Amino acid sequence: MKISLLQIDVAWRDARENIRRAESLMASQPCADLYVLPEMWCTGFDVSPDGHTLEQSKMGYEWMLRKAEELNASIAGSLAWQTEASLRSGRFVNTLFVMGPDGSVCHYAKRHLFGYGGEDAHYLSGQQRVVMQVGDVRVLPQICYDLRFPVASRNTAENPYDLIIYVASWPASRQTAWDVLLRARAIENQCYVAGVNRFGDDLHCHYEGGTTLIDPYGNSLFSLRGSAACASAEIDLQKMRQFREKFPVLKDADVFYKG
């Protein structure tokens, strides 16, 4: 599977402009099977969401559906969303959607809300671990702060996966943690890890990017930093399976999480 990661300079609460920027980056990387956008890619990381936030997110949602069909590819990215449960509490859900070329929609709700930044005041946390099938690849979707909590991303025999996707709005002030933790998740789970961060500035933070694809050995296949950019690489499932068979670390792992 060819995966393409989009490091967008996200315009604050401006879906039309962010769609234009995503279109431009996608055009530079044709023929991918899966395109991945950052966290809250069409609004920016909005910890005080309102009706305008939802309106912009709906525009992003509809565009992802159309674009997946147009490109005959899957498209992933998170949006500030509302569900029946969140509406009852007046909150939103930070939701990672994966749109398929056939019109299918899978989703994951962010489990670990960023209390330091106030996300927990306006969002509901998800409680469900989700593994999605994208082509031949089993994908575990995760969102930003989830990266700091490895138990929920443990690769298990009961619910295994091949690729973790982390979509993020991860500030430059904590860039080292981003770089190190992505490698750790790949090594400890013997899987590919796609870390897709935004670039640019919002009301509070500067973002350097650091978007990367890491193989099961912990090697970065590419790294984007310092500008809006897009890059692609292949997920080699045969190479990953051979490594797991030769060096079967996961069978000796502690059982913390069976979900």
What do these predicted regions represent?
Residues 107, 131, 198-259:
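C-terminal beta-strand edge segments of enzyme domains
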Residues 15, 23-101, 171-172, 176-191:
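Cys-nucleophile CN-hydrolase/nitrilase-fold catalytic domain and related Cys-dependent amidase chemistry
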Residues 87-159, 171-180, 242-249:
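Active-site catalytic loop in hydrolytic enzyme cores
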Residues 17-26, 148-154:
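Short, acidic/polar
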Residues 57-76, 148-230:
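CN hydrolase (nitrilase-like) catalytic-core segments centered on the catalytic cysteine
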Residues 8-9, 80, 110-111, 144, ...:
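Active-site beta-loop-alpha junctions enriched in small/polar residues
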Residues 1-10, 14, 107, 137-146, ...:
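Active-site-proximal beta-strand elements of phosphoester/diester hydrolases
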Residues 9-12, 43-44, 239:
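Feature marks short, surface-exposed loop/turn motifs that line or immediately flank catalytic pockets
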